[in-house]
């Protein structure tokens, strides 16, 4: 019986995706895997037979600890879209030939919606051809939009970064009494979980952002400007957190009102959304005649491992370990989800869910977690998100900067 396993990473990276890699690797070794292979650049790299032996690369405790503290995808990523196996089996024949060649008994793919699509297709094809290879999805996305899981590893650390940096921006903007507006653009194409996390900047030492704009609520320029004008009557500095995916009622992205449409990736998604904060800043300046500034947090949101949430790191590691356990228990076609079993104290456990019910679906922010005017989130959102950013991980510093591990 085959006793080797292989792990891949796909889609956009996070601050803790490598913690999940470490979790799968350590658990697979403990459960008896002879060799643990890694795909270089996901399924696309595997199709080119680009593999590494993780047993050789991660053979000591320091390597594992550095891996857990290293942002981005250690193995490299891709956005390769497998065709439907019923329409074109060519890549599947190649992949399953490689699984046989390397005596693979389990495949783990760490990623978001599109990665779960890959696992769903591989498990479906495997069932059709009678393969014994098990396929398990390991969730990852800062967008927090995967279904059937309380939240997704990667979100907590991104939320912690957003809340921290926005809190510092709020402090910076308060130095002058000149009337001004600062608009911070935060990632989130269709779901506003990241922008909503801006509320976590609030506390007894900070009011947090004045407005939060989410993709779930259509943008109304007149209503927005009236609200900003109202705020400026009572305070000099207004802070706005806006999702990059905010759209008008007709579905037009605000960023498209200031830039031409960008390229699409293999899954049909616009590769980069950028310009929402610029549009809003210009609108405020032109209509309200006040100083305004646009800030884009951009990719910094997903790679700030120096500000990672310990809760997030630990949960990312746990879902990796649970994925290995599920595969060695005979499960296939599953994704490891997080299930919240306690609020006070906060606690989540892992469970395996049907990946077919996750792939290509998106979880939006519940409308009852959004304020009636559509420009803030409620206390329920904060109660949900606050535990996910708690506690810190100390980087390993060398010569004044965090030490990372790489291929």
Q: Which residues make up each language-model segment?
A:
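N-terminal phosphate-binding or glycine-rich loops at protein starts, especially the Walker A/P-loop
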Residues: 2-52
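Short glycine-rich or small-residue beta-strand-to-loop segments that form or flank ligand, phosphate
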Residues: 4-12, 73-79, 105-111, 137, ...
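Short glycine/serine/threonine-rich phosphate/pyrophosphate-binding segments
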Residues: 14-24, 46-47, 90-93, 113-121, ...
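C-terminal non-catalytic interaction/assembly regions of soluble proteins
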Residues: 253-407
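Glycine-rich oxoanion-binding loops at beta->alpha junctions
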Residues: 49-105, 114, 153-155, 167
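Accessory alpha-helical/coil subdomains and C-terminal extensions
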Residues: 36, 98, 106-111, 117-132, ...
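Short, ordered loop/turn segments at secondary-structure junctions
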Residues: 10-12, 39-45, 79-80, 112-113, ...
């Amino acid at each position: 019986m085959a006793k080797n396993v292989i792990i891949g990473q796909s889609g956009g990276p996070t601050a803790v995706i490598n913690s999940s890699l470490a979790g799968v690797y350590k658990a697979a070794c403990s459960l008896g895997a002879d060799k643990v292979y890694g795909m270089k650049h996901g399924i696309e790299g595997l199709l080119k037979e680009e593999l590494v032996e993780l047993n050789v690369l991660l053979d000591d405790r320091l390597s594992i600890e550095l891996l857990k503290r290293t942002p981005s995808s250690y193995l490299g990523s891709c956005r390769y879209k497998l065709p439907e196996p019923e329409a074109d089996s060519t890549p599947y024949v190649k992949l399953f030939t490689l699984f046989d060649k390397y005596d693979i008994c389990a495949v783990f793919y760490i990623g978001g919606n599109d990665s779960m699509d890959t696992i769903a297709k591989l498990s479906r094809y495997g069932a059709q051809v009678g393969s014994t290879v098990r396929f398990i999805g390991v969730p990852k996305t800062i967008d927090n939009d995967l279904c059937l899981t309380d939240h997704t590893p990667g979100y907590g650390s991104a939320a912690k970064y957003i809340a921290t940096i926005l809190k510092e921006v709020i402090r910076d903007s308060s130095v002058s009494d000149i009337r001004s507006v600062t608009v911070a653009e935060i990632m989130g194409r269709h779901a506003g979980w990241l922008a909503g996390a801006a509320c976590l900047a609030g506390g007894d030492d900070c009011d947090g952002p004045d407005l939060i704009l989410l993709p779930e609520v259509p943008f109304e320029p007149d209503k927005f400007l009236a609200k900003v004008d109202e705020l400026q009557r009572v305070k000099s500095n207004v802070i706005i957190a806006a999702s990059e995916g905010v759209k008008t009622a007709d579905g037009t992205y605000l960023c498209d009102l200031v830039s031409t449409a960008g390229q699409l990736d293999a899954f049909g998604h616009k590769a980069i959304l950028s310009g929402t904060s610029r549009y809003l800043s210009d609108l405020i300046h032109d209509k309200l005649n006040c100083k305004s500034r646009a800030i884009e947090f951009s990719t910094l949101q997903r790679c700030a491992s120096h500000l990672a949430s310990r809760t997030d790191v630990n949960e990312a590691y746990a879902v990796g370990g649970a994925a290995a356990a599920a595969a060695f228990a005979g499960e296939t076609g599953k994704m490891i989800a997080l299930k919240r079993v306690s609020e006070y104290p906060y606690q989540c456990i892992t469970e395996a869910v049907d990946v077919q019910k996750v792939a290509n679906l998106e979880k939006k922010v519940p409308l009852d977690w959004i304020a009636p005017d559509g420009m803030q989130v409620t206390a329920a959102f904060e109660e949900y998100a606050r535990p996910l950013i708690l506690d810190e991980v100390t980087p390993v510093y060398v010569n004044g900067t965090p030490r990372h591990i790489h291929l």
